Amino acid sequence: YKNKEKFSADNLTVYEGDAAETVAKLPEPDKVFIGGSGKEMSQILETIAAFPKKIKVVISAVTIETIAETNELLGKYAPDFDVIQATVGRGRKIGSYHIMDTNNPVMIFTAYI
């Protein structure tokens, strides 16, 4: 709720609860963002796939395990998925030079399921 208020996102509805259970109770969405799904991604995607129309799904993944799981599951539900890697770096001075230190790249998967 804090980010919704902070960014005045009046067109955003927040649903609280366990994602795998909550998604099944929602009205059919246009788009779904999945991040930090833990061990429930398979169940979440299965629920989304049961909706009658195709839904745009965006999944963020940081760990190797989540990247592998997402790749496998999207291969099943949407073989033509897209993936990009986003990395942010912060400049740091070393002597008279500056280098970019990067942290945890994020893989962003997009698919219609």
Label each PLM-derived region with a short phrase.
Residues 45-105:
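C-terminal substrate-binding/active-site "lid" region of AdoMet-derived donor-dependent transferases
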Residues 1-29:
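S-adenosyl-L-methionine
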Residues 106-112:
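C-terminal edge-of-domain segments
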Residues 8, 25-30, 47-56:
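Short, surface-exposed connector motifs at secondary-structure boundaries
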Residues 12-13, 30-32, 56-57, 81-82:
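Structural motif
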Residues 1-2, 50, 113:
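Charged/polar positions on well-ordered alpha helices
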